[in-house]
A protein has these predicted regions:
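Amphipathic alpha-helical segments that line or abut small-molecule/effector binding pockets
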Residues: 28, 88-106, 150, 154, ...
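Amphipathic alpha-helical segments used for helix-helix packing
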Residues: 100-126, 133, 137, 165
């Protein structure tokens, strides 16, 4: 039987909502662990301890650790996609992405660094990359040649991924403003020869 404290945690929460809330708590704990710069062991027990939930609740949402790690990565990627989709200009996109992935670096480390240390995410990272490229392609929709459009989008996603990874690893020595300005200029300079300036925002 659950303790009074544990029962109190869900007091007033409809039964149908409790599973979703517990899953959200577990995902949030997974982001913190997977994105920690100290790289603690991401075990089911560690996740449950971080989320203050028992393992029984873990297994009501996830079949095993691998499924959970993929779900954590998918959650961060989805947040990143949603953030970029709502941006109207290159500067807004970069600023929003920095707020999401650098100001809260655990998310950035999950997105950019975790696939290199979690074998289960190798495939997930490869599967998500085309989504980011396609999103950028849509932002460059006025480019007439779809092949050229895709090459530009692919080169920008690759270049920006490398920049954000280096920034998260504190390898650039750039201030936040310098970093944002450089990323914005990179977007403009790469696309400018092919897109009329009004289309660049």
């Amino acid at each position: 039987m659950e303790s009074g404290q544990r029962r109190g945690r869900w007091t007033g929460v409809p039964l149908g909502d409790r599973l979703a809330l517990r899953r959200d708590n577990l995902i949030a704990a997974g982001v913190q662990l997977l994105g920690s710069d100290s790289r603690p062991a991401l075990t089911v027990r560690a996740v449950c301890r971080k989320a203050a939930l028992t393992e029984r609740y873990f297994y009501e949402s996830f079949s095993d650790r691998d499924e959970f790690v993929r779900a954590v990565y998918d959650d961060v990627c989805t947040r990143a996609m949603n953030t970029l989709t709502t941006a109207n200009t290159p500067r807004e996109a970069v600023e929003k992405f920095v707020e999401l992935m650098v100001d809260d670096p655990v998310r950035g480390r999950v997105l950019l660094l975790a696939p290199a240390v979690e074998p289960i995410l190798t495939r997930s990272g490869a599967e998500w990359m085309p989504n980011f490229i396609e999103l950028l392609q849509r932002k460059l929709s006025r480019i007439g040649d779809p092949v050229l459009q895709k090459m530009i989008a692919t080169s920008l996603v690759g270049g920006l991924s490398g920049l954000f990874t280096a920034y998260l690893n504190e390898q650039l020595g750039a201030t936040r403003k310098q970093f944002i300005d450089y990323c914005v200029n990179m977007l403009y300079i790469t696309a400018a020869p092919y897109v009329p300036s009004p289309d660049l925002g």
